């Protein structure tokens, strides 16, 4: 049976803090970072004790969620410098330190990738931290993908696979996702068998709440809200300084009481490409997240992290207001062509006309 997310376990809190103290930040001398617990990111005059992630309510779920969540791309892609001019994925030890540091600042939402890219790393990290019941775990299950048979058994299979990867007997949120051919003709909108499958998974105690969303257009989101908004609890929508069509979509989501989870604040790094993030462009990731959080119709901004420095930078957006100068910088950034063919779906569908 799913356990209530608000349960606080002092023993687990101690375990997490001790892990950070004994394992995580002892690595600073080996090239890690300044301890997150001891030195807040120097962008505000607030006291360190006040530098914690704020919370919002995730729509009709009623869940109290951190307004910044850790995205699934954190573990699935090679983004960590390997010291030899290339990149690699974070190790389990690195992931454990990052998740522990985030939780100590109040983060309680961990998202997943689309099913074909899922990783076992965050599940192993939570096991080491004994922290499963202190976070909200969201998985993404392929409702319909090219080459994947669309039926209830596939949804059961994807879900069981995700439960094993996360080393848990339940997840808090299960989102139906599609990664290509998101059209009315593709069959994505035949949700009858999907809803039946989700209902069964709920009855079995394997999922608590449901949602949907991925790469389809704002127009199709609006249609989905109208058709399925009464059933689902949440939606996942791309939103960033360049791709702002979500601002036309979010009111409809809230009208249905849906919790809103935004993705792609950096367009998977495209907005940060070739930027001097330790010099003239310092604070840019923070400001990109701050922009998203200014929209009070957003409940969670999920973002990828690949190093503990990025954890510290991203979370600081929760207690750092976007300055006029920062806003001007973002507006200039939004005018540049990102030049990423992989994200043509964002360019074509999510920019204001």
Residue ranges and their predicted role:
Residues 58, 70, 110, 137, ...:
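Conserved, mostly hydrophobic/aromatic
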Residues 73-75, 113-115, 140-144, 176-179, ...:
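Active-site beta-loop-alpha junctions enriched in small/polar residues
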Residues 75-92, 141-153, 278-279:
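Active-site mouth loops of central-metabolism enzymes
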Residues 148-236, 241-244, 248, 254, ...:
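Glycine/proline-rich, positively charged
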């Amino acid at each position: 049976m799913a356990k209530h997310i608000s349960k606080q376990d002092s023993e687990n809190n101690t375990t997490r803090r001790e892990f950070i103290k004994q394992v995580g930040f002892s690595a600073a001398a080996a090239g890690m970072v300044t301890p997150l617990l001891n030195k807040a990111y120097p962008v505000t005059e607030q006291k360190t004790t006040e530098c914690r992630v704020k919370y919002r309510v995730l729509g009709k779920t009623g869940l109290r969620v951190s307004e910044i969540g850790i995205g699934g791309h954190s573990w699935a892609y090679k983004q960590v410098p390997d010291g030899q001019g290339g990149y690699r994925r974070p190790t389990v030890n690195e992931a454990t330190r990052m998740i522990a540091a985030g939780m100590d600042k109040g983060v309680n939402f961990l998202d997943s990738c689309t099913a074909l890219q899922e990783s076992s790393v965050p599940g192993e990290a939570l096991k080491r931290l004994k922290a499963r019941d202190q976070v909200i775990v969201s998985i993404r299950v392929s409702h319909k993908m090219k080459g994947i048979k669309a039926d209830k058994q596939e949804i059961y299979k994807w879900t069981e696979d995700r439960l094993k990867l996360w080393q848990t007997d339940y997840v808090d949120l299960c989102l139906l996702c599609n990664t290509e051919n998101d059209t009315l003709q593709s069959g994505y909108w035949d949700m009858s068998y999907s809803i039946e499958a989700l209902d069964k998974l709920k009855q079995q105690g394997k999922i608590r709440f449901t949602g949907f969303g991925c790469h389809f257009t704002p127009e199709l989101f609006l249609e989905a809200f109208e058709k399925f908004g009464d059933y689902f609890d949440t939606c996942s929508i791309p939103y960033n300084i360049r791709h702002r069509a979500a601002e036309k979509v979010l009111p409809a989501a809230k009208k249905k009481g849906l919790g809103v989870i935004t993705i792609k604040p950096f367009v998977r790094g495209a907005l940060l490409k070739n930027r001097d993030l330790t010099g003239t462009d310092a604070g840019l990731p923070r400001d990109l997240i701050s922009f998203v959080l200014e929209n009070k119709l957003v409940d969670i901004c999920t973002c990828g992290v690949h190093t503990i420095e990025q954890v510290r930078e991203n979370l600081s957006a929760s207690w750092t207001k976007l300055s006029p100068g920062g806003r001007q910088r973002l507006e200039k950034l939004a005018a540049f062509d990102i030049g990423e063919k992989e994200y043509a779906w964002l360019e074509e569908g999510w920019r204001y006309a």
